[in-house]
Protein backbone atom coordinates (compact mmCIF):
# COMPACT_ATOMS: atom_id res chain seq x y z
CA UNK A 1 0.00 0.00 0.00
CA UNK A 2 2.80 2.40 0.96
CA UNK A 3 4.63 1.65 -2.32
CA UNK A 4 1.47 2.34 -4.33
CA UNK A 5 0.97 5.68 -2.57
CA UNK A 6 4.62 6.61 -3.13
CA UNK A 7 4.35 5.74 -6.81
CA UNK A 8 1.18 7.84 -7.14
CA UNK A 9 2.82 10.84 -5.47
CA UNK A 10 5.97 10.53 -7.60
CA UNK A 11 3.87 10.30 -10.75
CA UNK A 12 1.85 13.39 -9.86
CA UNK A 13 4.99 15.37 -9.11
CA UNK A 14 7.49 14.34 -11.74
CA UNK A 15 5.86 13.23 -14.97
CA UNK A 16 5.18 15.61 -17.85
CA UNK A 17 2.14 17.77 -16.94
CA UNK A 18 2.85 16.95 -13.28
CA UNK A 19 3.37 19.46 -10.48
CA UNK A 20 7.16 19.80 -10.83
CA UNK A 21 6.91 20.40 -14.55
CA UNK A 22 4.04 22.85 -14.03
CA UNK A 23 6.06 24.79 -11.44
CA UNK A 24 9.15 24.89 -13.68
CA UNK A 25 7.04 25.97 -16.66
CA UNK A 26 5.60 28.83 -14.60
CA UNK A 27 9.06 29.91 -13.47
CA UNK A 28 10.41 30.02 -17.04
CA UNK A 29 7.36 31.76 -18.51
CA UNK A 30 8.27 35.18 -19.84
CA UNK A 31 12.02 34.60 -19.81
CA UNK A 32 13.76 35.68 -23.02
CA UNK A 33 14.77 32.61 -25.07
CA UNK A 34 18.46 33.46 -24.77
CA UNK A 35 18.24 33.22 -20.95
CA UNK A 36 16.53 29.83 -20.81
CA UNK A 37 18.58 26.88 -19.59
CA UNK A 38 18.63 23.63 -21.52
CA UNK A 39 16.36 22.01 -18.95
CA UNK A 40 13.93 24.93 -19.16
CA UNK A 41 13.73 24.40 -22.93
CA UNK A 42 12.68 20.79 -22.30
CA UNK A 43 10.14 21.97 -19.73
CA UNK A 44 8.77 24.43 -22.28
CA UNK A 45 8.33 21.57 -24.72
CA UNK A 46 6.22 19.68 -22.21
CA UNK A 47 4.16 22.81 -21.50
CA UNK A 48 3.61 23.21 -25.25
CA UNK A 49 2.63 19.53 -25.51
CA UNK A 50 -0.31 20.08 -23.15
CA UNK A 51 -2.16 21.91 -25.93
CA UNK A 52 0.03 21.55 -29.05
CA UNK A 53 -0.36 25.25 -29.73
CA UNK A 54 0.69 26.09 -33.27
CA UNK A 55 1.62 29.61 -32.17
CA UNK A 56 4.06 28.36 -29.52
CA UNK A 57 5.73 25.73 -31.68
CA UNK A 58 8.38 27.95 -33.43
CA UNK A 59 9.69 29.30 -30.11
CA UNK A 60 9.84 25.80 -28.61
CA UNK A 61 11.65 24.49 -31.69
CA UNK A 62 14.13 27.37 -31.59
CA UNK A 63 14.81 26.85 -27.89
CA UNK A 64 15.49 23.13 -28.38
CA UNK A 65 17.70 23.77 -31.39
CA UNK A 66 19.72 26.26 -29.33
CA UNK A 67 20.02 23.63 -26.59
CA UNK A 68 21.35 21.00 -28.99
CA UNK A 69 23.89 23.38 -30.46
CA UNK A 70 25.28 23.78 -26.94
CA UNK A 71 24.69 20.20 -25.76
CA UNK A 72 24.45 17.92 -28.82
CA UNK A 73 24.32 14.76 -26.67
CA UNK A 74 21.32 15.84 -24.57
CA UNK A 75 19.09 12.86 -25.35
CA UNK A 76 15.78 14.14 -23.98
CA UNK A 77 16.11 17.47 -25.78
CA UNK A 78 16.86 15.53 -28.98
CA UNK A 79 13.70 13.46 -28.47
CA UNK A 80 11.64 16.57 -27.79
CA UNK A 81 12.91 18.29 -30.94
CA UNK A 82 12.03 15.17 -32.93
CA UNK A 83 8.46 15.44 -31.68
CA UNK A 84 8.30 19.15 -32.51
CA UNK A 85 9.23 18.38 -36.11
CA UNK A 86 6.77 15.48 -36.05
CA UNK A 87 3.95 17.84 -35.05
CA UNK A 88 4.17 19.69 -38.37
CA UNK A 89 3.39 16.39 -40.06
CA UNK A 90 0.72 14.97 -37.79
CA UNK A 91 -1.21 18.21 -37.40
CA UNK A 92 -0.90 19.16 -41.06
CA UNK A 93 0.75 22.49 -40.27
CA UNK A 94 2.67 24.47 -42.86
CA UNK A 95 6.29 23.89 -41.87
CA UNK A 96 7.42 27.00 -43.75
CA UNK A 97 11.16 27.01 -44.28
CA UNK A 98 11.62 23.69 -42.47
CA UNK A 99 12.92 21.09 -44.90
CA UNK A 100 11.68 17.50 -44.65
CA UNK A 101 10.24 17.68 -41.12
CA UNK A 102 9.35 13.97 -41.18
CA UNK A 103 12.89 12.98 -42.14
CA UNK A 104 14.36 15.25 -39.48
CA UNK A 105 11.96 13.89 -36.86
CA UNK A 106 12.98 10.31 -37.64
CA UNK A 107 16.72 11.10 -37.67
CA UNK A 108 16.50 12.96 -34.35
CA UNK A 109 14.45 10.19 -32.75
CA UNK A 110 16.95 7.54 -33.80
CA UNK A 111 19.82 9.64 -32.48
CA UNK A 112 18.03 10.13 -29.16
CA UNK A 113 17.62 6.36 -28.75
CA UNK A 114 21.29 5.84 -29.62
CA UNK A 115 22.20 8.38 -26.92
CA UNK A 116 19.84 6.94 -24.29
CA UNK A 117 18.52 3.48 -25.24
CA UNK A 118 16.76 3.05 -21.89
CA UNK A 119 14.89 6.37 -22.03
CA UNK A 120 11.12 6.06 -22.37
CA UNK A 121 10.95 9.59 -23.82
CA UNK A 122 13.35 8.65 -26.62
CA UNK A 123 11.37 5.50 -27.44
CA UNK A 124 8.23 7.64 -27.48
CA UNK A 125 9.74 9.99 -30.05
CA UNK A 126 10.91 7.07 -32.17
CA UNK A 127 7.51 5.41 -32.05
CA UNK A 128 5.73 8.53 -33.27
CA UNK A 129 8.25 9.18 -36.05
CA UNK A 130 8.08 5.58 -37.28
CA UNK A 131 4.28 5.57 -37.17
CA UNK A 132 3.95 8.68 -39.32
CA UNK A 133 6.62 7.33 -41.66
CA UNK A 134 4.18 4.50 -42.37
CA UNK A 135 5.91 1.81 -40.32
CA UNK A 136 2.95 0.90 -38.12
CA UNK A 137 4.40 -2.29 -36.65
CA UNK A 138 7.73 -0.79 -35.61
CA UNK A 139 6.06 2.41 -34.44
CA UNK A 140 3.82 0.46 -32.07
CA UNK A 141 6.79 -1.66 -30.96
CA UNK A 142 8.79 1.45 -30.04
CA UNK A 143 5.88 2.90 -28.07
CA UNK A 144 5.39 -0.41 -26.27
CA UNK A 145 9.11 -0.45 -25.46
CA UNK A 146 8.82 3.05 -24.04
CA UNK A 147 5.87 2.06 -21.88
CA UNK A 148 7.74 -1.03 -20.66
CA UNK A 149 10.63 1.21 -19.61
CA UNK A 150 8.26 3.52 -17.70
CA UNK A 151 4.84 1.95 -17.04
CA UNK A 152 3.74 5.11 -15.20
CA UNK A 153 4.18 7.38 -18.25
CA UNK A 154 0.59 8.37 -18.97
CA UNK A 155 1.58 10.27 -22.13
CA UNK A 156 3.11 7.21 -23.82
CA UNK A 157 0.14 5.18 -22.58
CA UNK A 158 -2.25 7.63 -24.24
CA UNK A 159 -0.33 7.87 -27.51
CA UNK A 160 -0.17 4.08 -27.73
CA UNK A 161 -3.89 3.86 -26.96
CA UNK A 162 -4.62 6.41 -29.67
CA UNK A 163 -2.59 4.41 -32.18
CA UNK A 164 -4.63 1.30 -31.32
CA UNK A 165 -7.84 3.32 -31.73
CA UNK A 166 -6.80 4.43 -35.21
CA UNK A 167 -6.22 0.77 -36.07
CA UNK A 168 -9.66 -0.16 -34.62
CA UNK A 169 -8.10 -2.33 -31.91
CA UNK A 170 -10.76 -1.16 -29.50
CA UNK A 171 -10.07 -3.29 -26.43
CA UNK A 172 -6.43 -2.26 -26.15
CA UNK A 173 -7.23 1.32 -27.15
CA UNK A 174 -9.87 1.94 -24.50
CA UNK A 175 -7.93 0.15 -21.75
CA UNK A 176 -4.86 2.31 -22.34
CA UNK A 177 -6.70 5.59 -22.84
CA UNK A 178 -8.91 5.18 -19.79
CA UNK A 179 -5.92 4.16 -17.69
CA UNK A 180 -3.95 7.17 -18.91
CA UNK A 181 -6.67 9.63 -17.89
CA UNK A 182 -7.11 7.84 -14.55
CA UNK A 183 -3.39 8.27 -13.89
CA UNK A 184 -3.22 11.84 -15.15
CA UNK A 185 -6.46 13.85 -15.44
CA UNK A 186 -4.38 16.83 -16.68
CA UNK A 187 -3.54 14.95 -19.88
CA UNK A 188 -3.94 16.86 -23.19
CA UNK A 189 -7.54 16.88 -24.38
CA UNK A 190 -6.79 15.62 -27.88
CA UNK A 191 -6.41 12.08 -26.54
CA UNK A 192 -10.19 12.05 -26.10
CA UNK A 193 -10.49 11.50 -29.85
CA UNK A 194 -9.46 7.86 -29.34
CA UNK A 195 -12.36 7.30 -26.96
CA UNK A 196 -14.65 9.24 -29.30
CA UNK A 197 -13.70 6.98 -32.21
CA UNK A 198 -14.34 3.88 -30.10
CA UNK A 199 -17.83 5.08 -29.23
CA UNK A 200 -18.49 6.10 -32.84
CA UNK A 201 -17.44 2.71 -34.19
CA UNK A 202 -19.86 0.98 -31.81
CA UNK A 203 -22.82 3.27 -32.55
CA UNK A 204 -22.65 5.12 -29.22
CA UNK A 205 -22.93 8.50 -30.89
CA UNK A 206 -23.91 10.61 -27.87
CA UNK A 207 -20.86 9.36 -25.96
CA UNK A 208 -18.74 9.90 -29.08
CA UNK A 209 -19.93 13.50 -29.29
CA UNK A 210 -19.23 14.16 -25.62
CA UNK A 211 -15.66 12.87 -25.93
CA UNK A 212 -15.09 14.81 -29.17
CA UNK A 213 -16.13 18.07 -27.51
CA UNK A 214 -13.42 17.53 -24.92
CA UNK A 215 -10.86 17.49 -27.76
CA UNK A 216 -11.77 20.84 -29.34
CA UNK A 217 -8.84 22.96 -30.52
CA UNK A 218 -8.27 25.96 -32.75
CA UNK A 219 -4.98 24.46 -33.93
CA UNK A 220 -5.80 20.94 -35.10
CA UNK A 221 -8.81 19.30 -36.69
CA UNK A 222 -9.15 15.85 -35.14
CA UNK A 223 -11.58 16.78 -32.39
CA UNK A 224 -13.72 18.61 -34.92
CA UNK A 225 -13.68 15.61 -37.25
CA UNK A 226 -14.91 13.37 -34.44
CA UNK A 227 -17.51 15.97 -33.46
CA UNK A 228 -18.78 16.30 -37.04
CA UNK A 229 -19.20 12.56 -37.60
CA UNK A 230 -20.94 11.96 -34.26
CA UNK A 231 -23.27 14.94 -34.72
CA UNK A 232 -24.11 13.80 -38.25
CA UNK A 233 -25.08 10.34 -37.03
CA UNK A 234 -27.25 11.90 -34.30
CA UNK A 235 -29.04 14.05 -36.88
CA UNK A 236 -27.69 17.27 -35.33
CA UNK A 237 -27.20 19.01 -38.65
CA UNK A 238 -26.33 22.45 -37.26
CA UNK A 239 -23.73 21.04 -34.88
CA UNK A 240 -22.29 18.89 -37.65
CA UNK A 241 -22.07 21.86 -40.03
CA UNK A 242 -20.42 24.00 -37.35
CA UNK A 243 -17.77 21.33 -36.77
CA UNK A 244 -17.17 21.10 -40.52
CA UNK A 245 -16.65 24.86 -40.51
CA UNK A 246 -13.87 24.44 -37.96
CA UNK A 247 -12.23 21.73 -40.05
CA UNK A 248 -12.29 23.95 -43.12
CA UNK A 249 -10.95 26.97 -41.25
CA UNK A 250 -7.87 24.89 -40.51
CA UNK A 251 -7.68 23.02 -43.83
CA UNK A 252 -9.82 24.57 -46.61
CA UNK A 253 -9.05 21.71 -49.00
CA UNK A 254 -9.76 18.93 -46.52
CA UNK A 255 -12.87 17.67 -48.29
CA UNK A 256 -10.84 16.92 -51.40
CA UNK A 257 -8.11 15.00 -49.58
CA UNK A 258 -9.79 13.44 -46.56
CA UNK A 259 -9.33 9.87 -47.81
CA UNK A 260 -5.62 10.42 -48.44
CA UNK A 261 -5.18 12.09 -45.07
CA UNK A 262 -6.80 9.24 -43.15
CA UNK A 263 -4.72 6.70 -45.06
CA UNK A 264 -1.53 8.66 -44.27
CA UNK A 265 -2.49 8.47 -40.59
CA UNK A 266 -2.77 4.69 -40.87
CA UNK A 267 -6.49 4.70 -40.09
CA UNK A 268 -7.99 1.20 -40.42
CA UNK A 269 -9.75 1.15 -43.83
CA UNK A 270 -13.21 0.22 -42.56
CA UNK A 271 -13.07 2.92 -39.90
CA UNK A 272 -11.80 5.37 -42.50
CA UNK A 273 -14.74 4.67 -44.80
CA UNK A 274 -17.20 5.16 -41.93
CA UNK A 275 -15.59 8.49 -41.02
CA UNK A 276 -15.61 9.74 -44.61
CA UNK A 277 -19.26 8.76 -45.10
CA UNK A 278 -20.28 10.58 -41.92
CA UNK A 279 -18.21 13.64 -42.87
CA UNK A 280 -19.99 13.82 -46.21
CA UNK A 281 -23.32 13.61 -44.39
CA UNK A 282 -22.10 16.39 -42.09
CA UNK A 283 -21.60 18.62 -45.12
CA UNK A 284 -17.92 18.20 -45.96
CA UNK A 285 -17.90 18.44 -49.75
CA UNK A 286 -15.17 17.16 -52.03
CA UNK A 287 -14.66 20.66 -53.48
CA UNK A 288 -12.87 23.33 -51.39
CA UNK A 289 -15.30 25.36 -49.25
CA UNK A 290 -15.38 27.72 -46.28
CA UNK A 291 -17.88 27.86 -43.43
CA UNK A 292 -17.95 30.14 -40.35
CA UNK A 293 -16.10 29.12 -37.19
CA UNK A 294 -17.80 28.57 -33.84
CA UNK A 295 -14.90 29.08 -31.39
Regions found by a protein language model. Give the residues of each.
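Terminal, low-structured helical/coil segments at or just beyond the last alpha-helical repeat
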Residues: 256-295
Amino acid sequence: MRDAVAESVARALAQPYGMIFARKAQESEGKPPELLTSYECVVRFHAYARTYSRERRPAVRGCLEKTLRAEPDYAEATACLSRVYMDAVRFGWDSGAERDPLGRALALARRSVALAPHSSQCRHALGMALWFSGDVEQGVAALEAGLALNPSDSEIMADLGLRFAVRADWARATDLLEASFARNPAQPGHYHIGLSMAHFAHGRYEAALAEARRARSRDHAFGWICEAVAAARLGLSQDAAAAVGEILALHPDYGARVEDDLAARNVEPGLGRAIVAALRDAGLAAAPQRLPRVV
